């Protein structure tokens, strides 16, 4: 399900990165050219995106934790799961609503966009320019906010850092803007009113990146 006559991705195109954690669903993408997006969990602006990319989870073994394929979205329908998979009319979610995203030929992302650590990912919204230039999943997020600028500076210094990282604290899971691996776990960094775990760093939403960098570096082990 690939072609040499492929559409062009533009810098400001909107791209949805979706989680692919089922080989059966991937077979449907390859063989039938559509992907189902549950409306109750759909990200903002759904289904109005130009492109769909797929983040493979651990079920894909050697290809796990990476984006290897993407495709142009050519249309969408609002349907129930029963309409999509009529062979399972009694499935518990048979009556739930989905966007059926109809896609064009699959394109191979080379090199793939990888996650340097196995990570939990929900939907990621990004743009054409970020997608085409990204080498790792963290590069897909915006880089203009204070959090984005701090990420870029840390990366330029060769300091490992993750963006939009899930923290699980006593059974409660939430996302922090930045997370830096340290000897005894993670140093979480949040901006604005996002939850901040004990021992983490919190900055104002419009904090000065230079000041943030000084505080972050002060918390890191000396090298």
PLM-predicted stretches and their roles:
Residues 3-7:
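Compositionally biased, intrinsically disordered low-complexity segments enriched in Pro/Arg/Gln/His
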Residues 8-173, 181, 206, 210-214, ...:
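Structured alpha/beta reader/binder surfaces that contact nucleic acids or chromatin modification marks
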Residues 173-197:
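Active-site beta-strand-loop-beta-strand hairpin of nuclease catalytic cores
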Residues 192, 204-207:
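Residues at the C-termini of beta-strands that transition into short coil/loop
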Residues 197-204:
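Active-site regions of enzymes building and remodeling cell-envelope glycoconjugates
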């Amino acid at each position: 399900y690939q072609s040499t006559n492929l559409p062009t991705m533009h810098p400001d195109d909107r791209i949805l990165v979706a989680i692919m954690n089922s080989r059966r669903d991937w077979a449907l993408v390859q063989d039938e050219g559509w992907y189902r997006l549950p409306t109750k969990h759909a990200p903002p602006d759904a289904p109005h995106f130009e492109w769909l990319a797929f983040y493979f989870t651990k079920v894909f073994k050697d290809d796990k934790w990476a984006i290897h394929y993407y495709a142009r979205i050519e249309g969408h329908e609002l349907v129930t799961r029963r309409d999509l998979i009529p062979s399972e009319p009694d499935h518990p979610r048979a009556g739930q609503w989905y966007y059926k995203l109809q896609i064009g030929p699959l394109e191979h992302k080379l090199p793939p966009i990888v996650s340097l650590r196995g990570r939990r990912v929900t939907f990621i919204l990004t743009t054409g320019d970020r997608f085409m230039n990204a080498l790792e999943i963290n590069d897909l997020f915006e880089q203009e906010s204070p959090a984005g600028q701090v990420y870029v500076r840390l990366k330029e210094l060769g300091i490992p850092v993750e963006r939009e990282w899930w923290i699980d604290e006593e059974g409660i899971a939430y996302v922090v803007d930045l997370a830096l691996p340290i000897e005894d776990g993670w140093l979480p960094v949040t901006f604005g009113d996002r939850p901040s775990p004990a021992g983490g760093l919190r900055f104002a939403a419009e904090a000065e990146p230079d000041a943030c960098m000084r505080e972050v570096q002060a918390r890191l082990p000396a090298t």
